[in-house]
Amino acid sequence: MPWSSLFQPVERLNAEAGLEDWYARLLARLGGTPQPFELALLGGLQAATPGLAFLAGYQAALRVLWPAAPWTAGALCVTENRSTRPADMNTRIEGQQISGRKDFVTAAECADWLLVAAREEGEGQMPRLALGVVRQGAPGVRIEPLPALPLIPDIGHARLHLQQAQGERLAGDGWDAYVKPFRTLEDTHVLTAVSAWLFGIGRESGWPDALLLRLQALLAGCAEVARQAPNAPATHLLLAGLFSEQQALAGELDAALAAGPACWAELWQRDKGLLRIAEAARAKRLEKARHIVAGF
């Protein structure tokens, strides 16, 4: 990881030409095929908004999940009727065809490929997931944009409609190998990207050295957690520590931003809640991890 890049002058990328264009320009700046953590770190650093930093972290997590993914933007499609439980899903994969609906797909507008969680068990069997890949624009694939949310409104969401769409089934169990670990991969890489965005703003705005040093330490911790197995109990414990460190900086961050350009403070006040979206789920994983490592 070229850490020296963190301390170089930053030219931020905006998304005036759309998210797909933004992501392509980011990859070009990073040499075309960056490692996932580098994509999250330097993508966050160069992002013009917290939402774009989120997008860099999200794409980085997807690349860890599916290392053979094309070098275009993608999305993971799981949620149906506000649930991610396999038993609540109706989307199915039969052979190489996928049919169903996903209700909340992040960054669908710029996604070239879509990873779709779909049930594949036989009649009378327990729900079992597979993960299939479909391409946006292919026959049977339709994206329905949803209204922008108050949080990171520059990153869109959509419903995905599939009608006998041609798909490639990825190897492994859809839940254990993909959906379950992605939660931790996303948390780690989004925290990295957003912290890098803050660090870049702080260097530009002349924040106190002590605050910048703590952000550096947080990023170094993210690098270590990114190397760990996402389903390991110790990983959940370490990741919880990183989020605790980030939350402990909240007052200092708000004060530093308030003392600088109003544009950065306004963006952060609007979007800082993105780091708390999955807070309840992380707390459950932390409690479970504590019991496992304690031998309960």
Name each model-derived stretch.
Residues P2-C110:
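Glycine-rich flavin
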Residues S99-G137:
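DPxDG-like acidic metal-binding loop motif
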Residues A258-F296:
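Glycine-rich phosphate/cofactor-binding loops in nucleotide/flavin-utilizing enzymes
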Residues S205, D209, C222-P233, L253-G260:
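Secondary-structure edge/capping motif, primarily at the C-terminal ends of alpha-helices
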Residues L219, L239-A250:
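Short amphipathic alpha-helical coiled-coil/interface segments
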Residues S99-G100, A138-L149:
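Active-site glycine-rich loop that binds ribose-phosphate moieties when present
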Residues P147-V225:
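Glycine-rich beta->alpha junctions and the first turn(s) of the following alpha-helix
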Residues L62, G132, L198:
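Residue-level signal for inorganic ion chemistry
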